[in-house]
């Protein structure tokens, strides 16, 4: 399918928006085509500017776990908007949503809302530094925690997709306080975190890496990370912007049984509206202004529309069997993808945790940044374009995840597997 209106809109956008997009990976540079411009979405489908329909496995990069335009969420937003879109003052809805988050997430005793995942991670790191009086942060190769200066070191997501080693504009004085070590390496944990001379304030980690593709934690990795950070007095931060309320109602920390000191959230907790949050132990969170000296603020923090959408979303997730059904559906689809790849004879590794997955075009198991980089990005680009022509919308990067929603039907998944087999056969025989 060709979207002529999308091509025209992209040309117009490039005149007034850098690269024609407001987030780099959307430009589709790594998959060799122009981006679709989306006009509307409903359930498991999105519709482009020409009105063409696509089965969506991106789901706004994760937030749409109940599918697009869920009527309960839309109604909550509409009902809230009648009373005004922003007050810059406290509201009852932010107290309600905060209470729901505290009840759900094991590590969170107090929570502060912000307007994006980047704000959440940036604020959590500042808080950890202020609380400990130390400066150095440790992250993991290929993990992405937003575009704050401290995180643009061996980062994932669009930084990895576009092959950018770092970013101009980030001073060396900032980067020198960030240490990046291999994900899933217990040896690196021991060597780095036990070194008292490094002055480490915190470790920030995606408990399931989701920005070099889906890379699950090796058995015992998160447990060892928790053990060492606790022994060394280092604040452990889980970046659950992707995994929060996605893997389970209590996030990855509930799923794996590992409780960090601080947690960053986003995506699902806003029901699809711009939102972020960071929270954790009360004694740490009490260091945030106005209770404490660590400053953080935001004009639109706790926006009433986002709070209303978030409350509606979390209520839906509380339905009996929601996660069991979603994860069973995801497992069946993943098994189908592996079966198709095996039947066609195309080398592929599929990593999945719950309803998050990535198909890597490589014969090598993907367990970290180094092995993720062995994936054939050119092959993925061809697969992406072939699937798009068939009306299937995948992430426009080998190093991003596919997300399942509760609205993906058996018929949807059967069709997706059929089109995948056609695409894989073309790739194999090319």
From Swiss-Prot:
It is found in: Cytoplasm. It catalyses: (S)-4-amino-5-oxopentanoate = 5-aminolevulinate. It comes from the Bacteria. Its EC number is 5.4.3.8. CDD domains: OAT_like (cd00610). It is an enzyme of class 5 (isomerase). Pfam families: Aminotran_3. The keyword Isomerase applies. Pathway: Porphyrin-containing compound metabolism; protoporphyrin-IX biosynthesis; 5-aminolevulinate from L-glutamyl-tRNA(Glu): step 2/2. One of its GO terms (molecular function) is glutamate-1-semialdehyde 2,1-aminomutase activity. Keywords: Cytoplasm, Isomerase, Porphyrin biosynthesis, Pyridoxal phosphate. Its cofactor is pyridoxal 5'-phosphate. Its main location: cytoplasm. GO terms for cellular component: cytoplasm. Gene3D superfamilies: Aspartate Aminotransferase, domain 1, Type I PLP-dependent aspartate aminotransferase-like (Major domain). The modification N6-(pyridoxal phosphate)lysine is found at residue 267. GO terms for biological process: protoporphyrinogen IX biosynthetic process. Belongs to the class-III pyridoxal-phosphate-dependent aminotransferase family. HemL subfamily. PANTHER family: GLUTAMATE-1-SEMIALDEHYDE 2,1-AMINOMUTASE, GLUTAMATE-1-SEMIALDEHYDE 2,1-AMINOMUTASE 1, CHLOROPLASTIC-RELATED. HAMAP family: HemL_aminotrans_3. Homodimer. This is Glutamate-1-semialdehyde 2,1-aminomutase. It comes from Desulfotalea psychrophila (strain LSv54 / DSM 12343). The lineage of its organism: Bacteria, Pseudomonadati, Thermodesulfobacteriota, Desulfobulbia, Desulfobulbales.
